[in-house]
A protein has these predicted regions:
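A short, basic N-terminal segment
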Residues: 1-58, 276, 280-286
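Walker A/P-loop nucleotide-binding motif
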Residues: 56-77
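Sensor-1/coupling segment of RecA-like P-loop NTPase cores
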Residues: 66, 73, 119-126, 150-152, ...
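Conserved AAA+ ATPase "SRH/arginine-finger" region at the nucleotide-binding site
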Residues: 95, 185-186, 197-210
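Conserved P-loop NTPase "ATPase switch" module shared by AAA+ and STAND
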Residues: 130-155
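C-terminal alpha-helical "lid" subdomain
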Residues: 2-18, 80, 117, 171, ...
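Conserved NTP-binding/hydrolysis module of P-loop NTPases
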Residues: 23-28, 99-118
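AAA+/P-loop NTPase substrate/partner-engagement loops
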Residues: 83-107
Length: 286
């Protein structure tokens, strides 16, 4: 069988073109590459509080924030911090669209490698026994759930059942990362809401942190000089309202325009062109 030909990237972001902007790689790709994770003051504060919750065996914590503020990056960062650390057993669940507590219990147990049991009580007993064994080994079990607003109110009962497993300390720590809709989920299950020890919120970045985030990404990609004039940055910040994800999306389009114009630093007109391209998606969905 003939060997398939390797595809060659021929778009604008070749290594040669990026070098014209003093970049070794693309700084604004929409990926979860941990090298580009910028921890602002608020991200650090939230992460520190979650670390305390885990190490103090406090049980249940929530990190809430609107779309695009970096919840998933912080969640993955949290998982990576414990993944290779002795004494911890973390699992990361990227989407938890659970409808029932049985469904939630089975999926979370499966993330730890436990078999599926037909009856919910059998599933809970098996999982409790597993957690007790971890505790005997002085291993702290951690569940990190992203997009937790997709859980039904009833499915939160699985978490309450897990938190009822105790042997002097909580056998499992649960951190939910969610959009603001999580308030409605908990409002329909106040018993589990009462178990939340820490509720943290991630908000849009202030201008100084936003500028530092964009510069940090450029620095990681090889460029020490600012990519934007002050006015150009303020236009990016304004249209994105301080939210990291749209700032990164607009900045990626700015990069494309700079290469087309053979320019080295983004001025306001470059950003305005990028904003025009960015806003087309909203017009298309209107």
């Amino acid at each position: 069988m003939p060997e398939a030909k390797k595809s060659t990237y021929r778009g604008p972001f070749t290594a040669e073109n990026l070098a014209r902007l003093a970049l070794r790689e693309h700084p604004f790709l929409p990926t979860a590459d941990p090298r580009f994770l910028f921890l602002s003051n608020q991200h650090t504060t939230v992460l520190d509080r979650v670390l305390d919750l885990i190490d103090l065996h406090e049980g249940l914590g929530v990190v809430e924030g609107p779309i695009g503020v970096g919840k998933t990056l912080v969640a993955r960062r949290l998982h990576s911090m414990f993944d290779m650390e002795p004494g911890y057993r973390p699992v990361f669940i990227h989407t938890a669209a659970y409808n029932t507590p049985t469904e939630a219990a089975r999926d979370i147990a499966a993330a730890f490698g436990r078999p599926t049991r037909r009856a919910q009580i059998a599933q809970l007993r098996d999982f409790e026994s597993f957690l007790v064994d971890l505790r005997k080994q002085e291993i702290n079990a951690i569940v990190i759930i992203d997009d937790a607003q997709k859980m039904s109110p009833a499915s939160l009962d699985a978490i309450q059942n897990f938190l009822n497993f105790e042997a002097r300390v909580r056998l499992i720590q649960v951190v939910l990362f969610a959009q603001p809709e999580i308030h409605g989920v908990f409002a329909a299950n106040p018993a589990v809401l009462s178990r939340v020890v820490s509720w943290q919120r991630l908000s849009p970045l202030p201008p100084d942190d936003a500028a530092a985030m964009l510069q940090f990404r450029c620095t990681v990609a090889g460029r020490s000089e600012s990519l934007f004039t002050e006015g150009a940055f303020l236009r990016v910040y304004e249209v994105a309202e301080g939210v990291p994800r749209p700032m990164i999306t607009v900045s990626a389009e700015v990069l494309r325009i700079l290469l087309e114009d053979n320019a080295f630093t983004a001025a306001v007109e470059h950003v305005d062109g990028a904003i025009a391209a960015y806003t087309q998606r909203h017009e298309a969905s209107a």
